[in-house]
Amino acid sequence: MQYYGLLESTRLASERGRCEGFDRLKYAKGWLKADATPAEEKTLDWEYLRGEIQAHGLRNSTVMAFMPSETSSQISNETSGLEPPHGLVSSKKSKSGVLTQVVPEVETLFNSYTTCWEVADDNRNYLNALGEIMKFNCQAISANTWYVPARHNNNKVPAKILMRDILHARKVGLPTLYYQNTNDEADLESQTGCESGACSI
């Protein structure tokens, strides 16, 4: 996606001019995020793209970014972007009241969803996936992590697990973490609500 976004941006730059401040961007100096990816993993001609950027510049300084979409996803009944859903059925309170949301295509994709509270057992695989996406993203991904205190001794998430996840996020290339969400086991039943195969609302 980033490759073709940048390529299209060079085409637009050749037609309409470079974005303001292009000369201050790393792209102007020949840098590409793909430079951090091992050569054997690359399937596109990044050197060609680098040449096009050098020749024409970019019309857009950012071509790919993932916004937090917790609120906007409710309007379109989508999941929250890169994040796993809170449950197959979940409720969120706002000033306008309580909104109950069912994940898209729950009837057919019931067993395909992984909720954030399932990820909570070990956030590292989720962070690994975000680290791969970050390699080609123009802006920092604000990643959340999840923890269920009831699954730990004395109902407390050990500090070493929190630190492990913070350090792991940095190791895989995530510059920012956002929320460290917690939940007790009592809330998990109401958020999933589909164990029998029929979701309760």
Where are these predicted regions, by residue range?
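Catalytic alpha/beta core of large soluble enzyme barrels
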Residues: 14, 18, 39-43, 52-59, ...
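Extended, well-ordered alpha-helical scaffold/bundle regions in very large, multi-domain proteins
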Residues: 1-33
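Conserved A3 ("GATE") glycine/threonine-rich loop of ANL adenylate-forming enzymes
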Residues: 1, 36, 69
